[in-house]
Swiss-Prot record:
Stretches that traverse the bilayer: none
UniProt organism field: Lithobates palustris
InterPro entries the record matches: Antimicrobial_frog_2, Frog_antimicrobial_propeptide
Full protein name: Palustrin-1c
Compartments reported by the entry: Secreted
Statement: the UniProt record of this protein carries the keyword Ribonucleoprotein: no
Entry GO terms, CC: extracellular region
Similarity field: Belongs to the frog skin active peptide (FSAP) family. Brevinin subfamily.
GO biological process: defense response to Gram-negative bacterium; regulation of insulin secretion
């Protein structure tokens, strides 16, 4: 139970940091007004979220099968 809470806390922390960085980048992109850069940033954010989701799924699978 403790390791599950620790893992979820880590995922939450990493997600919060990622979101914070995304908001800063979004603010900078809005000032520039360049649509192409915004699209590239959105794609990089989605890739980061995909990696985070894969890590969460792998962790959940590991905990469910108890093969950690």
């Amino acid at each position: 139970m403790f390791t599950t809470k620790k893992s979820l806390l880590l995922l939450f922390f990493l997600g919060t940091i990622s979101l914070s960085l995304c908001e800063e980048e979004r603010g900078a992109d809005e000032e520039e007004g360049d649509g192409e850069k915004l699209t590239k940033r959105a794609l990089s954010i989605l890739r980061g979220l995909e990696k985070l989701a894969k890590m969460g799924i792998a962790l959940t699978n590991c905990k469910a099968t108890k093969k950690c």
